[in-house]
Amino acid sequence: MDHKEIILLFLLFLKPGQGDSLDGYVSTQGASLHSLTKKQLAAGSIADCLAKCEGETDFICRSFQYHSKEQQCVIMAENSKTSSIIRMRDVILFEKRVYLSECKTGIGKGYRGTMSKTKTGVTCQKWSDTSPHVPKYSPSTHPSEGLEENYCRNPDNDEQGPWCYTTDPDQRYEYCNIPECEEECMYCSGEKYEGKISKTMSGLDCQSWDSQSPHAHGYIPAKFPSKNLKMNYCRNPDGEPRPWCFTTDPNKRWEYCDIPRCTTPPPPPGPTYQCLKGRGENYRGTVSVTASGKTCQRWSEQTPHRHNRTPENFPCKNLEENYCRNPDGETAPWCYTTDSQLRWEYCEIPSCGSSVSPDQSDSSVLPEQTPVVQECYQGNGKSYRGTSSTTNTGKKCQSWVSMTPHSHSKTPANFPDAGLEMNYCRNPDNDQRGPWCFTTDPSVRWEYCNLKRCSETGGGVAESAIVPQVPSAPGTSETDCMYGNGKEYRGKTAVTAAGTPCQEWAAQEPHSHRIFTPQTNPRAGLEKNYCRNPDGDVNGPWCYTMNPRKLYDYCNIPLCASLSSFECGKPQVEPKKCPGRVVGGCVANPHSWPWQISLRTRFSGQHFCGGTLISPEWVLTAAHCLEKSSRPEFYKVILGAHEERILGSDVQQIAVTKLVLEPNDADIALLKLSRPATITDNVIPACLPSPNYVVADRTLCYITGWGETKGTPGAGRLKEAQLPVIENKVCNRAEYLNNRVKSTELCAGHLAGGIDSCQGDSGGPLVCFEKDKYILQGVTSWGLGCARPNKPGVYVRVSRYVNWIEREMRND
């Protein structure tokens, strides 16, 4: 369930004025606690459940979980720090923030963490014990002060903060070393700052992170759930020396914020390594030469290269001497070099030797691996071994070996026969609903995957990531199918997927319920006992069942066939999606990028630019590709080709009848074809983005082309390469493209170099995968050379011109 649906649930189940009360809780969709001390109560809303937790007197309520369909609330003494979490359907877990926090605000009067040692390392005495010290403060004398176990507390408002009685007979009490919460101050470089400062150093108001005005940007809160990009508060999502924000001044894109450093010692760092693990952010070895053998510049020096990656700006990153480090979240340790001609370079650090590759343990660098050519699973999907890694709401799956953001026991070691590779959808616990995965969204523990049973996609086809499978029309009446999650489904199916008859929505037997009735939801189509989806459940239509021991279950409603003759952005041959570092890319699977065209001169037939089919009659390319001639008859377009020179009989060659240049001199142009292209498995348009859509930073996208390959294998055949999008704020740094990239452009590439678009790729597509299709986000435009380190390629941002594109096509 995505964030919008969670918000809708809150609105549905909260009473007026109760929303703010939940600010003190952390919510996790799909998580249930194993609790020993709990109460199970009837509750008609989240607000009811919240009130029961806040008013509990038999024990301290640290969490509650709400089951909407059961109208049930479970309030608990435990939380995820003290108890194990299991995945569960249709439940939201709410945990009180104060009991999850291990930091203090102010003097720590409200601290409720679990620190139980003093500054000098002495174990604390239990507050309820009378030996070795008879306490003045105890649970019985001060019941509201949280005097549990032997945890550090501040029941007397001591100005020096939390303390405890000690187990040392000679030391009655001592203070504890509790770090400050990063709300009024910051540790390190403010990566975990969660305060509410929303003005820059010069006093400018910050722009809200979920706004794209006045500055469009790629730090989209929904794409970076772990970065806490709330409201317009200063944050540090990209490894800067301190928190910053985009400003509301159109003439000032961004600026640092003035956040003071905390005066107490920072929290203890995690484990450090003398070898490479993950991205190497915790590498503390002494390698001091780059991959090409250049000596590293000392981090504290400013010659030959001036920079702000200094020990003062990054006090927690151990920037000692000239050792290779990764202070800012790069893909590997690096350093500035002592060569004035090479600003910086990655280092070669020996791997720690784990059998698990770094990429597998780091969900942030895992590629998107959801097939567009639809895979399916047999039965309940326990045997599914495909490469889908996206949930049914479009969330990215967490790697099975990773414990971030969700800790779990479904690991390859615990389930060796379950095929738990990378972050691919699997079914290790034999879930009857099919393959699932943990998500990379901290607020959504897990979801089912964006897959269908083979019986719903044509049936009987073996599961494979390679074999194309084209969905067939469902064998039911035209109206008895659903679009999306089936919220608008009004068919007459009245049995669950397991074959159990549905209970009528107006009935209260065998199951009594108050929320989902024809009276409470008059627009939800709750007629008779038909399957419906009144709460927008991502798993589709459901019903209360006639089985007294089964409250509800889901129905098996097929998806409706597409209304259009083709679907943009969906190739019929699965792309290779090679993650290699088209200089340095790999040869594409033939016809796996069916919108790619070759722009040629009509008479010589020589390829000189790429382009993208966006409708049967229109191609999008770069304006600079049309400098050879202003006459449309000079050009022709080749569609459905894989080889640049050897054109098969199924390749389409179509003349151009009109050239339309963008009126404000942007490097983008439309070509109208002399006749509509024939849509085949080899020729399919790409999808256009929504107007002004901004691709999130680090999104993995793909470029294709027949351009210059600099001697790498595959020349003459269509090549592909995977590139991460780089936020313009980063791309415009002095060491990269030095403010050359406009807001109407985007850049993408590997800063280490080695892979890029090149001459002959101009005008071609940069497409990004979104849930189930490829969207054309960029037109290959320019770069400083090909595949040079620190010089990513630049692409026209298509979303800024969608209104112009659609207007020209419509008015022609």
UniProtKB/Swiss-Prot annotation:
Cystine crosslinks: 49-73, 53-61, 103-181, 124-164, 152-176, 185-262, 188-316, 206-245, 234-257, 275-352, 296-335, 324-347, 376-454, 397-437, 425-449, 481-560, 502-543, 531-555, 568-687, 578-586, 609-625, 701-768, 731-747, 758-786
GO BP: blood coagulation; extracellular matrix disassembly; fibrinolysis; labyrinthine layer blood vessel development; mononuclear cell migration; muscle cell cellular homeostasis; myoblast differentiation; negative regulation of cell-substrate adhesion
GO molecular function terms attached to this record: apolipoprotein binding; endopeptidase activity; enzyme binding; kinase binding; protease binding; protein antigen binding; protein domain specific binding; protein-folding chaperone binding
PTM comment, free text: In the presence of the inhibitor, the activation involves only cleavage after Arg-581, yielding two chains held together by two disulfide bonds. In the absence of the inhibitor, the activation involves additionally the removal of the activation peptide.
PTM annotation (Phosphoserine): residues: 598, 690
Catalytic residue list: 624, 667, 762
Keywords: Blood coagulation, Cleavage on pair of basic residues, Disulfide bond, Fibrinolysis, Hemostasis, Hydrolase, Kringle, Phosphoprotein, Protease, Repeat, Secreted, Serine protease, Signal, Tissue remodeling, Zymogen
Subcellular location: Secreted
Enzyme Commission designation: 3.4.21.7
Family annotation (Gene3D superfamilies): Hepatocyte Growth Factor, Plasminogen Kringle 4, Trypsin-like serine proteases
Assembly notes: Interacts (both mature PLG and the angiostatin peptide) with AMOT and CSPG4. Interacts (via the Kringle domains) with HRG; the interaction tethers PLG to the cell surface and enhances its activation. Interacts (via Kringle 4 domain) with ADA; the interaction stimulates PLG activation when in complex with DPP4. Angiostatin: Interacts with ATP5F1A; the interaction inhibits most of the angiogenic effects of angiostatin.
Free-text comment about domains: Kringle domains mediate interaction with CSPG4.
Full protein name: Plasminogen
Species, as recorded: Rattus norvegicus (Rat)
Encoding gene (name): Plg
